[in-house]
Regions:
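Histidine- and/or cysteine-centered catalytic micro-motif in compact active-site loops
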Residues: 2, 38-40, 89
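Structured segments of extracytoplasmic/periplasmic soluble domains
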Residues: 2-4, 23, 109, 113
Length: 115
């Protein structure tokens, strides 16, 4: 959030931040350096080799980037809303190790708060 600045002090190299939150290769436009990027128009989800013609999380803001962890642990960062959302707990759907329907449902509810 805030391109790596906290209280006016740069705590994360801004060049690294820019690279981490920018598409890192042409195979999967929705992937940076260990961060998943929304708003790219296509994505290849974890564990599949298929490119889907949709945003990574369609109901989330286009500028969102996120970290996905084991058992559905998530960190969503949305610079336009100055928001960080962390999801911890048991997997929302045990059939998928990372991305589940939970993500879109969560963003439908969060978006309703901003309307």
């Amino acid at each position: 959030l805030n391109k790596g600045k906290w209280n006016g002090q740069q705590i994360l190299n801004e060049n690294y931040f820019d690279q981490a939150t920018t598409t890192s290769q042409n195979i999967n436009l929705s992937y940076g350096f260990l961060w998943w990027l929304n708003g790219k128009g296509s994505c290849m989800v974890p564990t599949l080799q298929t490119v889907f013609p949709i945003d990574f999380i369609p109901n989330a803001p286009d500028d969102m980037f996120c970290g996905l962890g084991k058992d559905d642990q998530k960190v969503y960062v949305i610079p336009s809303k100055k928001m960080v959302v962390i999801r911890m707990g048991n997997a929302a759907d045990s059939s998928s190790p990372a991305l589940t329907a939970f993500d879109n449902e969560l963003w439908t509810k969060i978006n309703a708060l901003y309307q």
